[in-house]
Regions:
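An N-terminal assembly and electron-transfer interface module characteristic of large anaerobic redox
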Residues: 1-229
Length: 229
């Protein structure tokens, strides 16, 4: 099981190695272990990632340099030696053509790193079949914004509000517009570029310089309310 912490993580890539991915959304009762090796002012989510690693709950972890906290967490986790596979993916600040090419190259470096670590060969067919189908149905929902929301909290909101909940934080709202049918027709260079385009074309997080597309959220007639976490 490969854990990840950001919606821009290319999780479909790992299906090409026969691996499954899961969001690392550990909710520890305390930070007793992480507080021993991390600064007290590190954010709660960063501490929870460190705690999970120290407890042996995430031995394969892909991180993204989306914020200063995640960069510090990566350094700390790397120093523990607890992860068999630990990788920091370089995420651009823009989604222009130049940045798409850079991100495509970053994804390919991740692929090569996992090939070297696992000894496995990348299976394109498995990669293509891993893409989730785009949701076409629309219904009223409550959007959750702000810092990361765990599945437990998401379910709690859903049960109390009695309405569908869309997690629009760092780990949720993952929707790729690229389709496997399109990718199958491309050579490898074009395929990874289109994949990078699909990842960067998601609803932008606040790391991105061009966040104007986020206004589409507030113009959605199905959005009936926002909970800011």
């Amino acid at each position: 099981m490969i854990h990840y912490v950001c919606k821009y993580t290319p999780i479909e890539l790992f299906a090409g190695f026969g691996e499954t991915c899961a969001v690392l959304e550990e909710m520890p009762e305390n930070f007793e272990m992480s507080d021993q090796i991390a600064h007290a002012n590190l954010c709660g989510f960063g501490k929870s990632v460190i705690q999970a690693v120290l407890q042996g709950k995430a031995d394969e972890l892909v991180m993204v340099n989306c914020c200063d906290s995640m960069r510090r967490v990566y350094d700390i986790v790397a120093s523990t030696g607890k992860c068999k596979f630990l990788y920091m993916l370089d995420l651009p600040h823009d989604d222009n053509e130049c940045e798409k090419e850079k991100f495509a190259a970053a994804i390919r470096r991740l692929k090569e790193a996992y090939e070297k670590y696992s000894g496995k060969t990348f299976d394109k067919a498995a990669f293509f079949h891993s893409f989730a189908k785009l949701r076409t149905e629309t219904k009223p929902y409550i959007g959750v914004l702000g810092v990361r929301v765990s599945g437990v909290l998401e379910d709690m909101i859903r049960e109390n509000i009695r309405m569908d909940v869309d997690n629009l934080t760092c780990t949720g709202g993952r929707r790729l517009t690229v389709t496997p049918e399109e990718l199958e027709k491309m050579d490898e260079d074009a395929m990874f570029l289109a994949y990078a385009d699909g990842l960067l074309g998601q609803m932008p997080c606040f790391r991105m310089n061009q966040s104007s597309r986020r206004t589409a959220l507030y113009l959605d007639p199905n959005l009936k309310g926002i909970i800011y976490h």
